Amino acid sequence: MKRILSIITSLFAVSFLLAQSNNSIATSSIKIEMLFPEGKTKALILSFDDGTFADRRLVKLMNDYGLKGTYHLNSNKLDTKGYLSKDEIKSLYKGHEVSVHTANHPALTALSKIDIIYEVVEDRKELERLTGNIVRGMAYPFGNNNDLVVDAIKGLGIEYARTVKDSYNFMIPEDFLRWDPSIHQFGKAYFIPNDSVNDKKELAGFYKLVIDFLKSDSPALLDVWGHSWENDGVGERWIEMENFFKMVSKRTDICSATQIALVDYINAYKNLKISVDKKIISNLSSMDVYIKIDNKAYKISAGSQLSIKKD
């Protein structure tokens, strides 16, 4: 009996190998790549924390250049000295994303699980009340996180959580609850007071990364984070911010988007249903998804199916 089973197994293996050599199966090696919304090859996230008065100037600057921003706010600090009023949140951030930064900006790694949950849920609830929108994103205060913190925010409706650990690359993070940005605004320029040598070095590094992003031939995501208040009181920093916006705003190959919009888009791409030979691709999501196969771009409309015709 064992010998018969061995023979059957061997025959099955041979049949499988022959099937693999068939042209219709061999096409499964087709490489499918994600493009960003509207078929763009690059995407830009601009992510700023805290919700201070300086956000007013930054939002206006973004609006002037047609850029989208993601703003992480501490709801219990609103209506206090130096921070925005609750009454202006909805109108000020119209067209941008408002996201969780916890209610009081504590170091979450120093809190118990129940206090972590409180900080996130209370902030989310109040920001939803102020904006009239569902809030699904977050930035960790001080960037502080660990396994306990990440475990605590799971199930709270948070779909991404940004750190402050610069990656210096253009890759999409694998873990959205440990989302490392590309770089801080201007690198670490201006971190050390009155150190023009360091400022020059860090600015050069920042602009080099931006230029590398602009020159990239592969799909690339540039995620720049910071605080609007870092620019306040120092004119040249606002000038630098505007120079950066000028560099990226008129590029037709860049998709400027809020972080949650890109998260939704990436998830829609990940949830595409693909046939074994990769010739049929179904998009069950409510948004259009763009892909590239053999250097050719395809649009898969929301709720539709794409059939690839290849020789």
Predicted features and spans:
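Bacterial Sec-dependent N-terminal signal peptides
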Residues: M1-S21
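Active-site metal-binding loops of divalent metal-dependent hydrolases
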Residues: F48-G51, T102, S228, Q259
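Metal-dependent polysaccharide deacetylase catalytic core of the NodB/CE4 family, i.e.
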Residues: N63-E159, V164-P193, A220-S228
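A Trp-anchored, charged/polar loop motif used as the substrate-binding/catalytic surface
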Residues: D195-K215
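C-terminal domain-boundary segment and adjacent tail
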Residues: S24-F36, D64, D79, E128, ...
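Boundary/entry segment of secreted carbohydrate-active catalytic domains
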Residues: S21-R56
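Alpha-helix N-cap and loop-to-helix initiation/capping positions
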Residues: L111-Y118, N198-K201, E236, E240
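Extracytoplasmic/secreted proteins, especially bacterial periplasmic and envelope-associated proteins
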Residues: A43, R57, D115-Y118, E122, ...
